[in-house]
Curated annotation (Swiss-Prot):
Keywords (A to Z) from UniProt: Membrane, Transmembrane, Transmembrane helix
Organism: Caenorhabditis elegans
Superkingdom as given in the UniProt entry: Eukaryota
Gene name as annotated: sre-30
GO cellular component: membrane
Primary subcellular site in the record, as a coarse category: membrane
Transmembrane segments: 31-51, 61-81, 121-141, 165-185, 192-212, 253-273, 283-303
Protein name: Serpentine receptor class epsilon-30
Family membership noted in the UniProt record: Belongs to the nematode receptor-like protein sre family.
Subcellular localization(s) per the UniProt record: Membrane
Length: 357
């Protein structure tokens, strides 16, 4: 959605969409979206709970990874603000119209307004959505950088916290995310420069991934060699195995994310060029917003310890009920065994008595 302030050169670029639909249909779709987001939030928060309860990775890695999952809440706040404008719960005082293109320079497809009055909350929601997207992009690169540092400082990284590493990486990634998000909203940069962080970070992350994989596989091969001359401490061996475990998990998550981004990218392009009806924008938009479903489930089921805890926690009432049923069945079996033993004893003594009479 592009907003143009009349009698000025000011433009506002928001990653929000509005559709020309009856209010009843908007209400029905919004109820579905809210229900899906509530369930998605439950899955996400449960996944974060499991990751924090069963910490299998270094504290610095968790410091960077958990916020990447939790930042979805910021995205959903922006989504809820958009829904409020669609349903006219927040009314700017004029019709917003239909806006289903990602970006355009066509004046007929932009929203012409006298000023930003009444749109402040929508602009804030749009900023939250842009900020979430770029926080994930730079956050992934920050995680890859932290794992590179862990591989370089293999001698004592496991035994020393070095909490300043994730703090510095977080500050840098957030400064970049906030700066680019503000620049996009004010259209200080166009679509090409807006895509540039993706173009730069993607190959950089792949190169870092290959470096970490090669380094740690070489170290593991050396550790497993009985004729090695180099001495590896227990913490160093654990660090190598942790890096490789993180890579395996990261590979699966990257495949899911690439698949997700590809579908969303094709969908947004199809909407922009009018290849599909505008109504399909709901499907593409919600497909993007509900990304924690595949990502969290992939993470939880990739590691056995997380998977077991996740299964126990996802339906606590059902699990408690099953535990009670299992306990009752066990007690009944024990009682039946005791009764059977008692009957057999009575029969034995009765037969013994009869044999003596």
């Amino acid at each position: 959605m592009i907003i143009h302030i009349s009698n000025s050169s000011s433009y506002i670029w928001l990653s929000v969409y509005f559709y020309k639909e009856p209010l009843s249909l908007k209400l029905l779709i919004s109820i579905f979206e809210l229900s899906s987001c509530i369930l998605c939030g439950y899955i996400l928060n449960l996944s974060i709970f499991v990751m924090l309860k069963i910490q299998l990775f270094h504290k610095n890695l968790m410091f960077l990874t958990v916020p990447l999952f939790a930042i979805w809440h910021e995205l959903i706040i922006g989504k809820f603000i958009t829904i409020a404008y669609r349903l006219k719960i927040v009314n700017p005082g004029f019709e917003l119209g239909e806006h289903t293109v990602f970006w355009t320079n066509d004046p007929d497809k932009t929203l012409e307004v006298a000023g930003s009055s009444g749109l402040e909350l929508l602009i804030f929601g749009g900023f939250l959505q842009w900020h979430t997207i770029y926080s994930i992009v730079f956050g992934i690169l920050a995680v890859a950088t932290e794992r590179t540092i862990a591989s370089v400082y293999i001698k004592d990284y496991e035994s020393k916290e070095r909490i300043y590493i994730p703090i510095i990486l977080t500050i840098i990634s957030q400064l970049l995310s906030i700066s680019i998000s503000l620049a996009i909203i004010t259209q200080s940069i166009g679509p090409f420069l807006a895509r540039l962080p993706f173009v730069i970070c993607a190959p950089l992350s792949v190169l870092v991934f290959l470096f970490i994989k090669h380094t740690n596989q070489s170290l593991l091969k050396e550790i497993c060699n009985p004729k090695r001359t180099r001495i590896f401490t227990v913490s160093q061996q654990c660090q190598v195995k942790e890096n490789l475990r993180a890579l395996r998990l990261g590979t699966r998550l990257v495949v899911v994310v690439i698949f997700y981004i590809s579908i969303c990218g094709f969908g947004i392009a199809a909407l922009t060029f009018g290849l599909i009806p505008a109504g399909f924008g709901h499907l593409i938009e919600n497909f993007l917003f509900l990304h924690p479903y595949p990502i969290c489930l992939t993470a939880m089921f990739s590691i056995p310890q997380w998977r077991d805890q996740f299964k126990k926690s996802i339906l606590p009432f059902l699990n408690r009920r099953l535990a009670k049923i299992e306990q009752v069945v066990t007690v009944r079996i024990e009682v039946n065994v005791q009764n059977s033993s008692s009957v057999e004893t009575d029969i034995y003594f009765r037969q013994l008595t009869e044999s003596w009479t």
